[in-house]
C-alpha cells in the first residue's frame, strides 16, 4: 500500500510517495498525488490544564494578571477539574497529528498524577514544578521564570540533573530579562524569548541551549519572538501552542500563524521546526 505525494524529511521533500509496510520513500508512482506526507508534529510547549478555561478568560488582563503565580489562571485551576481540562487538550493534540507533546505541569506531584490514566499513543514529556515546600515532582523541571522562583531555580535544576531529566525555563516573555543568569543554570531549553536581543540569542546559541517559541500565544499580549534571527543563527528551535485557554493545541493552527507573521522564514523551515523541533536537544549524548 502506498501514500502518494512528496515526503517531508529532515532534508526537505523527497520522492513521490511512501510505501507503508516498510516506510520507504519511492521515486516512481503511477497516478496523481494525494497530497504531501509529513511526519507527526512536535508540540514542544503546552499548558493543557487550562484548556477548558478558553471561553472564560477575562479580557484586558496583563500577562502577570492572567498567568502569574497569583493570577487568574491559577485561581481557575484551583476551582475546576484539571484532569477533564487536560483530556480536552489531549483530544486536540491527538486529532491534529501530533506525536510528541511537552507539558509544563502545574500543581506539583498531584498535577503530574493527572496524566496517569491518559491514553496517548505518542511521546509525552512532563515538566513538573513543586507546590509550596515540595521538592521537584518527576524527573523534569518546568520553571516559570527566574523572577518567579528566584534562588529555588538552582535547586530545581540540581534535582532534575540528578534524575537525568530535562530543564526548561520561561525567559524574556513579556519584557527583557538578563540572559546571563539563566545561561549559568545550563537549561536544556528556554521558552518564548520574545524580548531577547541579538546578543542574547548569540549567547544562547554559543551555550548550546535550545529555544521553544509560541507565536500565537505571545501575540495575545502584543509580543512576537524574533524567529527569523533565531533561524539565521541556526538555533535549535521548537514550536509550542502554550496555554490551552488562549490557543488550540493544534499545530496546524500554529504553522498557519507562523507562515502569516514571518514571511521571511521559508515554509520548509517552518515545517522542519514543526516536525523536527528540538532535534539537537533530544539527540544530545
Annotate each predicted stretch with a short phrase.
Residues 4-10, 86-93, 210, 215-220, ...:
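C-terminal helical cap
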Residues 12-21:
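A conserved glycine-rich beta-strand in the N-terminal activation segment of trypsin-fold
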Residues 23, 237-241, 256, 275-285:
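Structural signature of the urease/amidohydrolase superfamily beta/alpha-barrel
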Residues 51-84, 175, 180-185, 207-210, ...:
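Active-site gating loops and adjacent loop-to-helix segments of metal-dependent hydrolytic enzymes
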Residues 60, 119-121, 185-187, 230-232, ...:
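Short, hinge-like loop/turn segments at secondary-structure boundaries
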Residues 75-155:
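Active-site loop-helix segments enriched in His/Asp/Glu that coordinate
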Residues 134-245, 264:
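Active-site core of metal-dependent hydrolases
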Amino acid at each position: 500500500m502506498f501514500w502518494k505525494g512528496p515526503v517531508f524529511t529532515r532534508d526537505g521533500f523527497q520522492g513521490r510517495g511512501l510505501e507503508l509496510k516498510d516506510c520507504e520513500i519511492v521515486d516512481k508512482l503511477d497516478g496523481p498525488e494525494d497530497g504531501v506526507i509529513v511526519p507527526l508534529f512536535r508540540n514542544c510547549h503546552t499548558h493543557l490544564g487550562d484548556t477548558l478555561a478558553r471561553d472564560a478568560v477575562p479580557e484586558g488582563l496583563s500577562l502577570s494578571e492572567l498567568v502569574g503565580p497569583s493570577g487568574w489562571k491559577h485561581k481557575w485551576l484551583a476551582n475546576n477539574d484539571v484532569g477533564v481540562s487536560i483530556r480536552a487538550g489531549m483530544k486536540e493534540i491527538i486529532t491534529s497529528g501530533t506525536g510528541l507533546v511537552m507539558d509544563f505541569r502545574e500543581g506539583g506531584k498531584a498535577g503530574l498524577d493527572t496524566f496517569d490514566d491518559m491514553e496517548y499513543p505518542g511521546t509525552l514529556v512532563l515538566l513538573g514544578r513543586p507546590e509550596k515546600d515540595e521538592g521537584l515532582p518527576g524527573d523534569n523541571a518546568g520553571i516559570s521564570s527566574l523572577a518567579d522562583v528566584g534562588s529555588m531555580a538552582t535547586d530545581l535544576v540540581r534535582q532534575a540533573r540528578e534524575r537525568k531529566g530535562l530543564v526548561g525555563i520561561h525567559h524574556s516573555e513579556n519584557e527583557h530579562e538578563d540572559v546571563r543568569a539563566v545561561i549559568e543554570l545550563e537549561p536544556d531549553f528556554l521558552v518564548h524569548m520574545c524580548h531577547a536581543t541579538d546578543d542574547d540569542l548569540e549567547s544562547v546559541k554559543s551555550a548550546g541551549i535550545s529555544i521553544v517559541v509560541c507565536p500565537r500565544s505571545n501575540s495575545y499580549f502584543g509580543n512576537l519572538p524574533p524567529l527569523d534571527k533565531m533561524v539565521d543563527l541556526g538555533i535549535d528551535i521548537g514550536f509550542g501552542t502554550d496555554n490551552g485557554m488562549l490557543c488550540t493545541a493544534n499545530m496546524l493552527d500554529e504553522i498557519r500563524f507562523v507562515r502569516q507573521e514571518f514571511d521571511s522564514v521559508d515554509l520548509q523551515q517552518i515545517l522542519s521546526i514543526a516536525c523536527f523541533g528540538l532535534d539537537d536537544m533530544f539527540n544530545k549524548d
